[in-house]
Amino acid sequence: MTDNQENKPKKLTLSNTKLSLNKSFDSLASTQSFVNAKSKTLVEVRKSYSGSTTTLSLNKEKGSLETGSSSGSEEFNRRLSILKKAAEQSKLNDNSQISTLSKLASINQSIASQEDPIEVEQEESSDTNKVKEEPKIEEVKDIEESTLQTPKKKEDIFVKSPLVGTRTRYGIESEKTVDKVTENKVIAPKPKVEESRKFKKTDLFNMVGDDENDNRNRTRSLASIKRAREKEKRKSLVQVPEKVYREITLPEVIGVGDFANAMSERVSDVIKELMKLGILANASQTIDADTAELVATHLGHAVKRVQESDVENILITNDKEEDLRSRAPVVTVMGHVDHGKTSLLDALKSTDVASGETGGITQHIGAYRVTLADGRAITFIDTPGHEAFSEMRSRGAGVTDIVIIVVAADDGIKPQTVEAINHAKAANVPIIVAINKIDKPDIDIERIKNELYMYEIIGEEAGGDVMVIPISALKKINLDKLEEAILLIAEMQNLKASPFGSASGVVIESKIEKGRGALTTMLVQRGTLKSGDIIIAGTAYGKVKKMTNDKGIEVLEATPSVPIEIQGLSHVPHAGDMFNVVQTEKQAKDIAEYRERVAKEKKISIAPRSSLEDLFLKASGSSKIKELPLIIKGDVHGSVEAIAGSLLKLPNDEVKLRILHSGVGPITESDVSLAHASSAIIVGFNVRAGANAKTAAEKEKVEIRYYSIIYDLLDDVKAIMSGMLDPIIREQYIGSVEIRQIFNITKIGKIAGSYVTRGIIKKGAGVRLLRDNIVIHEGKLKTLKRFKEEVKEVREGYECGIAFENYEDIREGDTVEVFELIQEKKQL
């Protein structure tokens, strides 16, 4: 073949060393239409490189192919018949092809899962080639032989064949060709197996399906499947929580935030519901129970209404009968001042407490535990005998089992003795009368017993049920009889209490001590109080940090009938308040807040109401009622309470005593600031002001008064209030004058010539003009003369000239009464 023939671009021959397509195909699947049917034939395109032998055979066949191209239409028809036979043969092999493709699909999936597609592809291709290599080559040989003898047309003929080879517009080039020249037989070498390219995961499905269904039948990658499964797993794990409907306990008042937490709702949702009801509130504000019930019902929750006082229900406990144990009796010693109550306790507990008290009176309550020789114990409570401490005596009788009324043999029954008897009767407590000071001479015990009959206190010797025991605390006479009487009555009462469970009891006294804070003396009545317990006492609450007994020894627990002193409360409670142990500090806080609200409401309800007139008078400074503001600070709460109660009992018709603040502890700067702002007097009872408070008081000129005996305090306050009272103005008659002659003087006016008939008259004194025994004028004496000289006074039996201030209607025969006004100091 010449060079010109080789350079023609449009002439197709088989003379090239490699048969290739002038137009490439992107897809590996094609469709061939026949007369009345469609057939799908897989054509696998591979890059094949043939050796030199194939090239030589193709060059030899080049001439025969060119000569055969001019043979005519017979050769063309022959070639067409061969192709039809090949198509029919492909139809017969469809089933085998489908099974082959399914195997290839499974191989492709295993390739994807093992992530080693190249090795699997090589093994599969090698196995497939071993099985089908020879028949495919033979079929290709037959087709090429017929094709070489058939003239080529310029029509496009596309063929799908199961044979492996390279597709062209005019036929198929076999990977393996066999030389047809018998005389020069050349054995085709095995095709060079090169490393196949990595199959794409979509190749198998492109080979199986139609072009129009390729996208629908495309297989998802394994990673995509894993992601989908993980997503479904996460969806199954993350479940939307179902709304829980609760039963809400609603008090009378509840905060919006607490209300939302109780329902497990968001605060914003609760606020939206409140806005629908026309209520604007934030999380820190409170709403009433009716509004909260509407919101809770709308949100689907059930509501249980409770009273605010129900917070104290947790304090109610019932003891089991089998838990009860015998306890020591609690004995209260009561009586008049200086009748020997504290001395009796000193004798019983062998300590000298009385010597440390000012004025010989007990300033506050004390609790002591005395252990007798036989091991039995008695708890004594000492109460003040002064009349101001009536509340403390009342509390003492309320917490005791037995009352000992001490009566001095040389003094007899006194007012506080009668009061103590009444307190004991009101508390329904057994009474023992101890007639003290029998060691003194000239005493009459029978007289004391007869006086007791007047108050229904009848001794056993007279057929009564009251034990009357003569004793001497100083000489320790008959103290053993007194102890036996106490134990006998206690045994008759069968006193028992449960030492198990949460402790409860009563506050005996409370005070503030520098460096230790609030100290509270308590008497345990049931249960066992332990260090670290959370207690509520009145409006004070806190954790017990330290406990000490009556001897000052630190203890870890206290059983019934044991008095102890604790520290750790938020502030000092009131004496007489009950204390209880609670589980959590929140419970204690809720109870304390409720009690504070109740106390505030009670204080507002009993406060006197001022009229509009009183407010105007007070603003103008002309109010008839004067006020004495006071600030009271004391060492213990009982003393402060007694002082305040005694002061408020003072008559206050014209002077009103107003206690701005009363508390326990030293006088502070805040007390001085309050006193300066309200012009108050600070009263300190057994306390002193600190250095800073003293400096502030001197600077602000605030008066601070210190007292150690309640008598002196009450007397001074009474004197201050008396000094604020308006003085009493009294009219005192001093004389009478008879008018005998009237003189008219131009510059002066009328002068009455008079005669002093009684007493004495003074210049500037008050006069009352009487005519026919009727008072026609009352005024002052302006002029008093005797013989043209001004004098200060004229006595009875003398004549004088008088003139009145701003009055001249004087007649002969009128009578003038002369008097003067005397101011007297008013006393409370």
From Swiss-Prot:
UniProt entry keywords in alphabetical sequence: Cytoplasm, GTP-binding, Initiation factor, Nucleotide-binding, Protein biosynthesis
Domain (tr-type G): residue spans on this chain: 326-496
Residue segments, region G4: 436-439
Annotated region described as G1, given as residue ranges: 335-342
Residues reported to bind GTP: 335-342, 382-386, 436-439
Region (Disordered): 48-76, 112-148
Family matches, as PROSITE patterns: G_TR_2, IF2
One GO MF term attached to the UniProt entry: translation initiation factor activity
Gene Ontology CC terms: cytoplasm
Region (G3): 382-385
One Pfam family it belongs to: GTP_EFTU_D2
Compositional bias segments (type: Acidic residues): 116-126
Biased composition range(s): Low complexity: 65-74
SUPFAM superfamilies per UniProt: Initiation factor IF2/eIF5b, domain 3 (SSF52156), P-loop containing nucleoside triphosphate hydrolases (SSF52540), Translation proteins (SSF50447)
Biased composition (Basic and acidic residues): 127-144
Region called G2, residue ranges: 360-364
Polar residues composition bias: residue spans: 49-58
UniProt-listed CDD domains: IF2_eIF5B, IF2_mtIF2_II, mtIF2_IVc
Places the protein is found: Cytoplasm
Cited NCBIfam families: IF-2, small_GTP
Entry's family note: Belongs to the TRAFAC class translation factor GTPase superfamily. Classic translation factor GTPase family. IF-2 subfamily.
Protein name in the entry: Translation initiation factor IF-2
